Design a protein with these regions (language model features):
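Extreme N-terminal leader/targeting segments of oxidoreductases
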Residues: 1-41, 60-63, 172-174, 188-202
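N-terminal Rossmann-like FAD-binding beta1-loop-alpha1 element of flavoenzymes
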Residues: 37-67
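Short hydrophobic core segments
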Residues: 43-45, 152, 164, 174-190
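Conserved Rossmann-like nucleotide-cofactor binding loop
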Residues: 50, 74, 188
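Glycine-rich active-site loop/strand segments that organize a redox cofactor
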Residues: 71-129
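Helical element adjacent to the flavin cofactor pocket in flavoenzyme catalytic cores
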Residues: 128-146, 152, 172, 184-189
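A conserved short coil-to-beta-strand element within the FAD-binding core of flavoproteins
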Residues: 148-162
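PAS-family sensory domains
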Residues: 168-169
Length: 202
């Protein structure tokens, strides 16, 4: 094999890698202010894909004074292993998820690591059970600060921050304070299954 062909092959491989990574990182990022005291900067309600993505972005921006809570047990957050009836996601498989542009974190990278690149190419739509497995891996590999079995029962103004009442599965309640609260309770979170009174009044 001559040097020209070797260089051409290496360049083609590099260009393929560049295309792959650009495809994986096509996602915006946002800045957030740093933590300044013991009050949580952000309380995230819901540890499904949206809640995990918000937590990851905050941690990337060095906002570590956050907490994510979900009333479901670990692995049962979101609809994927509970009430989702469709066998696959409805989004195109190449659409970015909670990875925030990190090339090794998209579903595609995880899928290819588990099943191979050929399997990814043959895949039409992502099966919901595999998506749930991916989200479990995403949460674990990033060590996101999620507390399961914790429900938010009340949000109240506390003079410059929000007082959130948290109830554990054993019924024990406590109040935490946060500057911001993100309701990441799913697509229907503001649709009607459960709606906090302050949101219903909007």
């Amino acid at each position: 094999m001559d040097a020209t062909r070797t260089a051409t092959d290496a360049l083609a491989a590099l260009e393929a890698r560049v295309r792959f990574e650009l495809d994986c990182v096509d996602h915006p990022s946002a800045a957030w202010r740093p933590a300044v005291d013991a009050v949580l900067d952000v309380l995230i309600v819901g540890a499904g894909q949206s809640g995990l993505a918000v937590a990851f972005q905050l941690l990337r921006d060095k906002v570590t004074n956050i907490r994510v809570v979900d009333r479901a047990p670990a692995g049962r957050e979101g609809p994927w292993r509970s009430f989702a009836r469709m066998p696959t996601l409805r989004s195109p498989k190449a659409m970015n998820g909670p990875d925030l542009g990190v090339p090794s974190l998209p579903y595609r990278a995880w899928h290819e690591a588990r099943f191979g690149a050929a399997d990814w190419q043959c895949l039409d739509m992502i099966p919901k059970d595999l998506w749930a497995d991916y989200l479990d891996w995403f949460r674990r590999v990033l060590a996101l600060p999620v507390a399961n079995g914790v429900e938010v029962t009340r949000l109240a103004d506390a003079g410059g921050c929000v007082a959130a009442t948290l109830r554990a599965t054993d019924g024990a309640e406590r109040v935490v304070h946060a500057r911001r609260v993100v309701l990441a309770t799913g697509l229907d979170g503001l649709g009607r299954w459960t709606m906090p009174a302050p949101v219903a009044a909007l």
